């Protein structure tokens, strides 16, 4: 092999190795990006507990959400950014509608679509509601007004949402005595 042939060959090998390294780095970094559901879960984990937020004198953004809600998942990044900007001035609270513990709050705030955002002043009084997937600018304008104790510019704003209705009827099985096996047999159905 001559010296002229080895230089292009080495250059080609170096380029192949560099391309492989770049692809490897991109794959590793890409796999580390949290999914929207993971971001929603981490937001909920880091949120101020409802009991704490309702007892203090700070304004609050109360979000009703569900893990399965695609609009909630899409909003997770915007909420995380807003939390970074506003967490020194207000509390961010997240209540999962799939947790029966929050049924009284779901009913109190008339949650009929998610995500639903309730803006509460420092005294815990609702100042407005926004429902669905909303632009960050709408949420930010409402939060600015909330911390300044001004009227919210975008109350009753509605974006894409996931419909929700609370099942207010107790399940049929809970109406029977748990010691009775008759609650397991349906009329006209034999095994």
Swiss-Prot record:
One Pfam family linked to the record: Thioredoxin
Transmembrane segments: 14-30
Keyword Disulfide bond in record: yes
Keywords of the record: Cell membrane, Disulfide bond, Membrane, Redox-active center, Transmembrane, Transmembrane helix
Disulfide bonding pattern of the chain: 69-72
PROSITE patterns referenced in this protein's UniProt entry, alphabetically: THIOREDOXIN_1, THIOREDOXIN_2
Domain Thioredoxin, first and last residues per copy: 27-148
Annotated GO MF terms: oxidoreductase activity, acting on a sulfur group of donors, disulfide as acceptor
The keyword Transmembrane is annotated on this UniProt entry: yes
Chain intervals with Polar residues compositional bias: 165-185
First-listed, main subcellular location of the protein, grouped into a coarse class: membrane
Gene Ontology cellular-component annotations: plasma membrane
Bilayer topology: Single-pass membrane protein
Subcellular location: Cell membrane
Location of region: Disordered: 165-191
Function: Required for disulfide bond formation in some proteins. Acts by transferring its disulfide bond to other proteins and is reduced in the process.
Family of this protein: Belongs to the thioredoxin family.
Protein's recorded name: Thiol:disulfide interchange protein TxlA
Biological source species: Synechococcus elongatus (strain ATCC 33912 / PCC 7942 / FACHB-805)
Taxon lineage: Bacteria, Bacillati, Cyanobacteriota, Cyanophyceae, Synechococcales
Gene: txlA
């Amino acid at each position: 092999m001559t010296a002229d042939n080895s230089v292009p060959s080495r250059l080609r090998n170096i380029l192949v190795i560099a391309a492989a390294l770049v692809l490897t780095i991109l794959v590793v970094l890409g796999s580390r990006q949290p999914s929207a559901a993971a971001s929603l879960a981490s937001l909920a984990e880091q949120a101020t507990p409802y009991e704490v937020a309702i007892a203090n004198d700070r304004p609050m953004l109360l979000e009703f959400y569900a893990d399965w809600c695609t609009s909630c998942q899409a909003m997770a990044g915007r909420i995380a950014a807003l939390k970074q900007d506003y967490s020194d001035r207000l509390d961010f609270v997240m209540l999962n509608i799939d947790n029966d513990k929050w049924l009284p709050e779901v009913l109190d705030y008339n949650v009929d679509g998610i995500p639903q955002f309730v803006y509460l002043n420092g005294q815990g009084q609702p100042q407005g509601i926004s429902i669905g997937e909303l632009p960050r600018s709408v949420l930010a304008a409402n939060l600015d007004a909330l911390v300044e104790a001004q009227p919210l510019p975008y109350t009753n704003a509605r974006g894409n949402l996931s419909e929700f209705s609370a099942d207010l009827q107790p399940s049929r099985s809970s109406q029977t005595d748990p010691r009775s096996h008759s609650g397991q047999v349906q009329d006209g159905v034999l095994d």
